[in-house]
UniProtKB/Swiss-Prot annotation:
Annotated ATP binding sites: L37, G38, R39, G40, G41, F42, G43, V44, V45, K60
Protein name: Serine/threonine-protein kinase prk-2
Organism: Caenorhabditis elegans
Segments of skewed composition (Polar residues): 328-338
GO MF annotations, alphabetized: ATP binding; protein serine kinase activity; protein serine/threonine kinase activity
One protein family per Pfam: Pkinase
Protein's gene: prk-2
Presence of the UniProt keyword Transferase in the record: yes
Residue numbers annotated as active site: D158 (proton acceptor)
Keyword entries, A-Z: ATP-binding, Kinase, Magnesium, Neurogenesis, Nucleotide-binding, Serine/threonine-protein kinase, Transferase
UniProt domain Protein kinase: residue ranges: 31-285
EC number: 2.7.11.1
Length: 441
């Protein structure tokens, strides 16, 4: 993929320097093309620098063969994306169109590039999920932007977290990628070019795509995703049948007001769905929110507090994981980090570990610590670390640590009691992995 991207970037540079682009040398005089920023279904976006003031910009290249819909600006035929960006030039929450150039092979669209910024997908992914106050701070801006676009008769048609960038300094949001955008009309649309998991059920069931109603649905999906760190639907079947299963599950504690707003946005019947104006006037959206500086400061303080708590409970966590390693393989698989139920699953397993009675484990642990001579804390830590380690590289590291421990300690006669306790501290799975390492050596 990297080779393909670099090849396409090289081809674009050849294109700008070739015979076919001599009539459009103005772009090369005004901008210096850099590396690729990203790509989507409608084009490729590159970094660029404006030569007159060294301002950072983004340049999107669209091939003529990939243009699905055309419009006219001053009598010249251009992709609909350029026309829609021009119509939204005064909308604060839309990425600003700076210039555009027509070349025989396609079009170059020059846009502002907020810096430093991150798209909402990466922002949510980096945080797992965001607080309700921060979600309100961002969602309110997005809803206002979508409403103002509609006021200018522009329908984006691809509202999702990847098409929203967040300024990390101010917290302001910008709606990007108008490749699927079109003129808003009252009648239904016969085509859909956006992301299917953000698409309303009426499109899958009846090929019915209504502009405003579909935008409201996408906003509901976006808000749910920002709070839960996951999309509400896995596939088209979920989208079309979720209303039969009752209210959507929430995996974090949220207020009744935001649940009410999401349920109104994700109403199955498009004609019963709330309007964009109703979203902006909803009590949850109108509720006063902290500033971006205060929100980010609270997030940093919370992370610091959580890391401190993790440090104090490190020993307890090691013992808990040792017990979990003794459980059947199915339970360990269900609690792997990175799974869909990571936040809820881990907290549930933690509470079960402390609340459920485990007489066998408890008696075994009592015998190990009171009746037998226990291994040293350093040896126990190395053993537990080896039992937790999923990869061969970390097993080597644990073994190396054990060898270093033996070097620093004076040689002692073998103690069968200590060896027995150490073996019990390590799971059978870890023993097999370590045996495999020794066999390779």
């Amino acid at each position: 993929m990297k080779k393909l991207a670099s090849l396409q970037f090289f081809n674009l540079k050849l294109l700008l320097n070739g015979e076919s682009s001599r009539g459009f040398s103005k772009f090369k005089k005004n901008y210096k093309l850099k590396a690729e920023l990203g790509r989507g279904g409608f084009g490729v976006v590159y970094r660029a620098v404006r030569t007159c003031d060294n301002a950072l910009v983004a340049v999107k290249f669209i091939e003529r063969s990939n243009v699905k819909e055309w419009a006219r600006i001053n009598g010249e035929q251009v992709p609909m994306e350029i026309c829609m960006l021009a119509k939204c030039s005064k909308v604060r929450g839309v990425i600003r169109l700076l210039d555009w150039y027509s070349i025989p092979e396609g079009f170059l669209i020059v846009m502002e590039r907020p810096y430093p910024c991150i798209d909402m997908f990466d922002f949510i992914k980096g945080q797992g999920k965001i607080s309700e106050d921060m979600a309100r701070f961002l969602f309110r801006q997005i809803a206002v932007t979508v409403h103002e676009c509609v006021q200018n008769r522009v329908l984006h048609r691809d509202l999702k977290d990847e098409n929203i960038v967040i300024d990390l300094v101010t917290g302001s949001t910008k709606l990007i990628d108008f490749g699927a955008a079109t003129v808003l009309r009252r009648s239904q649309y016969s085509d859909f070019q956006g992301t299917r998991l953000y698409c309303p059920p009426e499109w899958f069931l009846h090929s019915l795509y209504l502009g405003r109603e579909a935008a409201v649905w996408s906003l509901g999906v976006l808000l749910y995703n920002s709070l839960n760190g996951r999309l509400p639907f896995r596939n088209e079947k979920d989208i079309c049948t979720a209303h039969l299963l009752g209210p959507l599950p929430f995996f974090v504690p949220v207020s009744a007001e935001v649940k009410d707003l999401i349920s109104k946005c994700l109403t199955f019947d498009p004609f019963q769905r709330c309007s964009l104006e109703a979203i902006l006037n909803h009590p949850w959206v109108k509720q006063q929110t902290l500033s971006w500086d205060a929100l980010t400061k609270n997030k940093v303080q919370k992370k610091t507090s959580e890391s401190s708590d993790d440090h104090h409970s490190e020993t307890l966590g090691d013992h808990s994981e040792t017990e979990e390693d003794r459980s059947p393989p199915t339970s360990s698989v269900s609690q792997q980090p990175g799974s869909a139920d990571e936040g809820v699953g881990l907290s549930a397993s933690s509470s079960n570990t402390h609340n459920q009675k485990k007489p066998n484990h408890k008696e075994f642990r009592m015998a190990k610590t009171s009746l037998l001579a226990p291994p040293t804390s350093i040896e126990m830590k190395a053993a537990v670390q080896a039992s937790k380690t999923p990869t061969q590289f970390n097993v080597h590291t644990a073994l190396k640590n054990q060898r270093q421990i033996k070097k620093h300690h004076s040689p002692q006669p073998p103690n069968s009691t200590v060896l027995t306790a150490l073996r019990r501290a390590m799971s059978r799975e870890a023993q097999n992995r370590i045996s495999g390492v020794f066999s390779q050596d």
